[in-house]
UniProtKB/Swiss-Prot annotation:
Function: Na(+)/H(+) antiporter that extrudes sodium in exchange for external protons.
Name this protein carries in UniProt: Na(+)/H(+) antiporter NhaB
Catalytic activity of the protein: 2 Na(+)(in) + 3 H(+)(out) = 2 Na(+)(out) + 3 H(+)(in)
Alphabetically ordered keywords of this record: Antiport, Cell inner membrane, Cell membrane, Ion transport, Membrane, Sodium, Sodium transport, Transmembrane, Transmembrane helix, Transport
An example Gene Ontology molecular-function term: sodium:proton antiporter activity
PANTHER family linked to this entry: NA(+)_H(+) ANTIPORTER NHAB, TRANSPORTER ARSB-RELATED
Gene label: nhaB
Native source species: Escherichia coli O127:H6 (strain E2348/69 / EPEC)
InterPro entries referenced in this protein's UniProt entry, alphabetically: Na+/H+_antiporter_NhaB (IPR004671)
Recorded family membership: Belongs to the NhaB Na(+)/H(+) (TC 2.A.34) antiporter family.
Compartments reported by the entry: Cell inner membrane
Cellular component GO terms, alphabetical: plasma membrane
Length: 513
């Protein structure tokens, strides 16, 4: 019997999301206009809380849908205007170009990145050294490339290797269901479980590595570019400005990587079983023999394009998004990717998040129009200039650990800039606050998958169920990094940021605009 019209509409609304989630969103949409009639300020904060809720529930439904519905309603009832949303989007066009073109550009360099991580995995036998290598490689790549792409590449390597061994363990060459362990005998299951633990730890080290590297440069994370633009910094300026905090934090993060592996804490320390290594090495040897001259040329070309990318970013030869577009053009032209559909696949990863970011800007417009953060900013600005840095760092960190970094970073840098333009703080203090906001937004966010887009991407990937990486386990494995990075970052903001920045100015390396 066919279901009723009402039931069909209910099932279609937000698709496979739980009924309680659908009901919650409908209640939000009904309550918001009523509260807005009574108190626009309270309604604005309620909208922000609801939006953060949709981000926290990203595994139930992609936030673009519920967040977008809330944003559309906010414009309709007058919390902000469509014109203000357009202004916010226009002001952050560089970030949208970064997401559209840079992420797509790196897609065409995946073969090179896969080659790098495969060589690391099979060449280094020491687990401590391998973990450190993955963390450092992910950090370096994320300083110039998109963190999601770096994690996507590591996931591709892990899924590929897991599939190779799973087929051997199940004695089925055409094993397509990697989650089915029913054909694997007891001995192989023990080895497979050890292999899962090994892959889990490597994925977490790589994920944290993207956060360590991503905070250091203006292209490492989307919010970095927003902050750099607001402060008027180019690539080199941004790196030097952040270095009093980011360099010590990077060292602390790498030491944490070695420590948890050495002491086997928090689920780390599992080594690659020798039987698995033999199978993977045999497969890699066969792959290398089958690699044609055309394949080798592709790798060389991608490496040269990588050098161009780093050089163009460092010298600020063009806007970041346009450099990304040049990477797309060069990579496709020189590696023979000419089909429209093949090129189109490169954009599937970035465009949903680009649309979500536009929704972020709608909520930011509401925050500005309703002056929601004015009381918090007034409270922070009443403190001494030195205390302001730590307070901004802490407030950013708390919100970033449960919400999206781009959203949080955009809100706080806008408020700090408004305070500077009104004369509440000096330009010099504003530049120090920009560093506190950027590091506070990036570092504590490793606490949960909600805070780090790369972690959320890993959690929702095909790899997570294969290696038994749940939300709770990810939070637990991230805990030592969360504590170390957050505390180290706070101490650096408190004690090293101002004096080292002053020394850089005296040396003539940086200057206040």
């Amino acid at each position: 019997m066919e279901i009723s019209w009402g039931r069909a509409l209910w099932r279609n609304f937000l698709g496979q999301s739980p009924d309680w989630y659908k009901l919650a969103l409908i209640i939000f949409l009904i309550v918001n206009p009523l509260i807005f009639l009574i108190s626009p300020f309270v309604a604005g904060w309620l909208l922000v809380a609801e939006f953060i809720f949709t981000l926290a529930m990203a595994l139930k439904c992609y936030p673009l849908l519920p967040g977008g519905l809330l944003a559309i309603e906010a414009v309709f009832i007058g919390m902000t205007s469509a014109e203000h949303v357009r202004e916010e989007v226009a002001a952050n066009l560089e970030v949208l170009l970064l997401l559209m073109f840079m992420v797509a550009g790196i897609y065409f360099m995946k073969q090179l990145l896969l080659f790098i991580f495969t060589r690391l995995l099979l060449s280094i036998r020491s687990k401590m050294l391998l973990s450190l290598s993955f963390c450092v490689a992910a950090a370096f790549l994320s300083a110039f490339l998109d963190a999601l792409t770096v994690v996507a590449v590591v996931i591709s390597v892990a899924v590929g290797f897991y599939g190779i061994y799973h087929r051997v363990a199940s004695s089925r060459a055409e094993d397509t269901d990697l989650q089915d362990d029913s054909h694997i005998d007891k001995h192989y299951k023990v080895v497979l479980e050890q292999f899962r633990g090994f892959l889990r730890s490597l994925m977490m080290h790589a994920g944290v590595g993207t956060a360590l590297g991503g905070v250091m440069t203006m292209v490492g994370e989307p919010q970095n570019l927003i902050i750099a633009k607001a402060a008027g910094w180019h690539f080199g300026d941004f790196f030097l400005r952040m270095s009093p905090v980011t360099v010590p934090v990077l060292i602390c993060g790498l030491l944490t990587c070695l420590l948890v592996e050495k002491l086997r804490w928090f689920g780390y320390g599992e080594t690659l079983p020798e039987k698995v290594r033999e199978v993977l090495q045999q497969f890699d040897d066969q792959s290398r023999l089958q690699r044609t001259r055309q394949d080798k040329i592709r790798l060389i070309v991608q490496a040269i394009i990588g050098v161009w990318l780093v050089t163009a970013l460092a010298l600020h030869l063009a806007e970041v998004g346009l450099i990304g577009l040049s990477v797309i053009i060069l990579a496709t032209s020189l590696t023979g990717v000419t089909d429209e559909h093949a090129i189109g696949k490169a954009f599937t990863e970035s465009l949903p998040f680009t649309a979500l970011l536009t929704v972020f800007f709608s909520v930011v417009a509401v925050i500005i129009d309703q002056q929601l953060f004015s009381p918090i900013i007034q409270f922070v600005l009443q403190a001494s200039e030195h205390a302001q840095l730590s307070l901004f760092y802490i407030f950013n960190g708390l919100l970033s650990s449960i919400s999206d970094n781009v959203f949080v970073g955009t809100i706080y840098i806008n408020e700090a800039k408004a305070a500077m333009e009104s004369g509440a703080i000096t330009l010099k203090q504003y530049e120090l606050l920009a560093v506190a906001i950027n590091t506070g937004t990036n570092l504590p966010s490793v606490a949960t998958p909600n805070g780090q887009a790369a972690f959320l991407f890993l959690l929702t990937s095909a790899l997570a169920p294969l290696i038994r990486l749940s939300y709770g386990r990810m939070v637990w494995m991230a805990l030592p990094y969360t504590l170390v990075l957050t505390v180290a970052g706070l101490l650096c903001v408190e004690f090293t940021l101002a004096p080292v920045t002053e020394w850089f100015m005296q040396m003539g390396w940086i200057a206040t605009l």
